[in-house]
């Protein structure tokens, strides 16, 4: 069982703070939208307010809520209730606890097959000629996960809403409680398998200086002073660039000129990011893609999988501070 709930709680503590319908026949597929210029992978609330009514634009809320019980145990909760309480008008739900993950896998949030993912996105109105804006209300790791999955199947016309739902409301954006069902579209699969790393590739990276391994968890976790997984520390050879370092104090992504200081400019090096369960790792990967890095993958199993195998080494380094400090 994964411990992703704890990973996301840790990231929040460090500064990141479906509709089910039945019908006798499926709705007719929407006609192809007019092709639009490729948009930036990061859009502002002002941009979204201006383009919200564009017929080719699909807005999706990818929120998963992290809740705790009286004993302090954390768990993931479907974001449906928070969506129904108020969302960006016209938005749909990108359900990472539902059909955007493999329902038959033992581990939560396991990637579905490319075809199943494309079909699920198509059911949300995402097609080859649409544009997609993704957001969440939990620091953007969930939105980044869906963004990376879209990229994995070859879809590049998606963006994150900078600052998430908080930025939308801060800019005066209204919230809606109305559900909107979009006609389904066809989303093609042009798979990019190199965007996902497996345990074997990560093992090989330990002795391969040509591969860069990035741990996106907070420095206290990287050093091994505290852990939520089977064993403390980090994968040998990894450097630490915590996800919290991607954001300013308002929850917006930091300017590119500041982020490039964290990641450097060796754009062609094979780079693998990891976290606890393959969600938060997509944030660093998203930033690196924006900065022009060309060979990035996320380790989907991350420390959930890695630390469960006693044959996989872990390194403790109390004097380490990571690339970005605390």
Model features per residue range: what roles?
Residues 1-11:
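Bacterial N-terminal signal peptides that target proteins for export
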Residues 9-19:
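Bacterial N-terminal signal peptides
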Residues 22-326:
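Cytosolic catalytic domains that perform sulfur/thiol-centered chemistry
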């Amino acid at each position: 069982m994964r411990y992703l709930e704890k990973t996301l709680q840790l990231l929040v503590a460090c500064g990141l703070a479906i509709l089910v319908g039945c019908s006798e026949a499926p709705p007719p597929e929407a006609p192809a939208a007019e092709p639009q210029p490729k948009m930036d992978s990061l859009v502002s609330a002002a941009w979204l307010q201006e383009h919200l009514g564009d017929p080719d634009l699909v807005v999706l809320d990818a929120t998963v809520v992290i809740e705790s019980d009286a004993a302090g145990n954390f768990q993931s909760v479907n974001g449906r209730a928070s969506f129904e309480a108020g969302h960006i008008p016209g938005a749909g739900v990108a359900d990472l606890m539902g059909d955007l993950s493999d329902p038959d896998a033992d581990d939560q949030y396991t990637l579905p097959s490319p075809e199943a993912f494309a079909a699920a996105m198509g059911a949300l109105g995402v097609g080859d000629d649409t544009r997609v804006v993704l957001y969440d209300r939990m620091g953007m790791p969930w939105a980044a996960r869906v963004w990376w999955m879209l990229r994995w199947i070859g879809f590049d016309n998606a963006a994150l809403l900078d600052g998430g739902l908080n930025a939308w409301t801060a800019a005066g954006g209204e919230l809606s409680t109305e559900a909107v069902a979009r006609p389904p579209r066809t989303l093609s699969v042009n798979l990019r398998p190199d965007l996902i790393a497996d345990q074997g590739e990560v093992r090989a990276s330990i002795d391969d200086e040509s591969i860069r391994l990035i741990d996106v968890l907070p420095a206290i976790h990287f050093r091994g002073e505290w852990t939520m997984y089977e064993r403390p520390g980090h994968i040998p050879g990894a450097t630490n660039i915590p996800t919290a370092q991607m954001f300013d104090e308002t929850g917006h992504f930091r300017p590119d000129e500041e982020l490039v200081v964290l990641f450097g400019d060796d754009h062609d090096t094979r780079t693998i990011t990891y976290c606890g369960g393959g969600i938060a790792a997509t944030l660093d990967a998203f930033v690196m893609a924006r900065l022009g890095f060309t060979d990035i993958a996320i380790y989907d199993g991350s420390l959930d999988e890695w630390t469960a195998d006693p044959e996989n080494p872990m390194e403790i380094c109390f004097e380490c501070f990571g690339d970005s400090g605390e």
